[in-house]
């Protein structure tokens, strides 16, 4: 990366930093790193937008500090007159900015040396690219910068949460290491976009409230409406990942859930069924008027969500497509179904059993794939195969221990061990096991929907 030479003539950036009651040290660390590590020919301004902070030190003290430290006006302080939330505050920050390119950055970051040139260079090549730096971690306790961003890019879960996924690993010494990596989604706190293009494609959805879902909505919209989203390895920015949520939610509203309904209804077509499978409570939720966003989609002549899945995120697992069967895995004798028991699926854990919810719980939805995996969105069933051993959910792989055979005999057989899935006489909230195959009804299972068996 250090050997790459960039043109002196690149679009100039307005870096937009939104803050609300941010700590003095982390806010100024962010701003100083931007100004100090951005060549002046590329930095038009830093727009520091205060979303109605009520801490005294962020009022006159901050105003005076900015005036004394940057008398040339490179840092501008803009304030909202009421609490807007991160989404509407970013719209306000973008409207206040006058540079060629908008770079949105959270208020608890550190820009690294050489961070801005790769972003501006990529946009200068194609104004329809939205580009993100690689995100390194800053420890939230020690505030130490750790250059561990690696090659992770963005994905999403069907519950419409952002997820990190591994990009194509490239050796650091390879010339290909510096090439941008296409990404289905972005985290949303750190990205660059040409200012006019940002507004051409609809900025943010102003009907979304406070925080949540806006990053996926923008990601889907960019791809579906003719743009591209990339991570740029030679641009690196540190970010403090906090142990608690930095935003307050007026009225304790589930803003992520409500915003995600708006996203699903406008952009996901029939695939919104998977969001509602996870969030049945949102089916009756008032999500406001989305007519303007639907008109925007038509005006921009955007493609379908199926096109997005096929062309941008082809490895995204779809529970009811290209599978043998899917839905509840039910033991008739006990009326128990396999169930995650609401455990964190980013961890490895034993799969449990719970009274069948007849499609009312996403925790009971599994798919039997053509590779004979019994799986969830990212994890597959596996077991050691010993008599009475439990069955775990682990990240899917090609391990033979993850192969299960299910046929019209209604057994589910672990291929590597030849053992059968068995309730073991367990109760609801207990754990399923494998045992030597018999004809016992505790080993008889059916799936809710058979597509090809």
Predicted regions span which residues?
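A short, conserved alpha-helix in the catalytic core of glycosyltransferases
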Residues: 118-119, 185, 189-202, 207-235
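Acidic donor-binding segment of Leloir-type glycosyltransferases
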Residues: 35-79
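N-proximal low-complexity "stem/linker" segments adjacent to membrane-targeting elements
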Residues: 1-36
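Lectin-like carbohydrate-binding module/patch detector with strong preference for beta-trefoil
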Residues: 317-453
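Conserved donor NDP-sugar-binding/catalytic core segment of glycosyltransferases
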Residues: 110, 114-164, 228
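Active-site nucleotide-sugar/metal-binding loop of Leloir-type enzymes
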Residues: 35, 68, 91-101
């Amino acid at each position: 990366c250090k050997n790459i030479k960039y043109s002196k003539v690149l679009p100039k950036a307005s870096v937009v930093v939104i803050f609300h009651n941010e700590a003095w040290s982390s806010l100024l660390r962010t701003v100083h790193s931007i100004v100090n590590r951005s060549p002046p020919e590329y930095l038009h301004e830093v727009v520091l937008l205060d979303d109605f902070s009520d801490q005294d030190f962020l009022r006159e003290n901050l105003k005076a500090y900015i005036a004394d430290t940057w008398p040339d006006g490179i840092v501008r302080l803009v304030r909202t007159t009421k609490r807007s939330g991160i989404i509407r505050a970013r719209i306000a920050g973008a409207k206040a900015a006058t540079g060629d390119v908008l770079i949105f950055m959270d208020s608890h970051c550190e820009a690294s040396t050489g961070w801005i040139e790769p972003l501006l260079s990529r946009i200068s090549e194609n104004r329809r690219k939205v580009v993100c730096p690689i995100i390194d971690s800053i420890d939230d306790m020690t505030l130490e910068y750790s250059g561990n961003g690696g090659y992770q890019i963005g994905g999403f879960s069907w519950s419409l949460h952002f997820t990190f996924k591994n990009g194509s690993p490239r050796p650091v010494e390879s010339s290909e290491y510096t090439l941008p990596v296409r990404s289905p989604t972005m985290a949303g706190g750190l990205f660059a976009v040409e200012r006019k293009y940002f507004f051409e494609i609809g900025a943010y959805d102003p009907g979304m409230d406070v925080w949540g879902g806006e990053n996926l909505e923008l990601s889907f919209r960019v791809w579906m409406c003719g743009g591209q989203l990339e991570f740029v390895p030679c641009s690196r920015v540190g970010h403090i990942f906090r142990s608690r949520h930095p935003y307050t939610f007026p009225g304790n509203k589930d803003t992520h859930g409500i915003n995600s309904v708006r996203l699903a209804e406008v952009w996901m077509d029939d695939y919104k069924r998977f969001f509602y499978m996870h969030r049945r409570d949102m089916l009756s939720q008032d999500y406001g008027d989305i007519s303007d966003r639907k008109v925007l989609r038509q005006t921009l002549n955007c493609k379908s969500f199926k096109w997005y899945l096929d062309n941008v995120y082809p490895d995204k697992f779809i529970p009811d497509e290209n599978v043998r069967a899917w839905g509840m895995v039910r033991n008739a004798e006990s009326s128990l179904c396999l169930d995650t028991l609401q455990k964190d699926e980013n961890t490895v854990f034993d799969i449990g059993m719970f009274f069948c919810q007849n499609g009312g719980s996403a925790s009971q939805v599994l798919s039997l794939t053509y590779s004979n995996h019994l799986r969830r969105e990212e994890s597959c069933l596996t077991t050691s195969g010993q008599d009475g051993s439990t069955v775990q959910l682990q990240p899917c792989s090609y391990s033979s221990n993850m192969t299960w055979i299910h046929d019209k005999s209604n057994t589910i057989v672990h291929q590597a061990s030849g053992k059968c899935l068995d309730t073991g006489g367990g109760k609801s909230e207990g754990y399923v096991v494998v045992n030597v195959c018999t004809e016992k009804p505790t080993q008889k299972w059916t799936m809710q929907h058979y597509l090809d068996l």
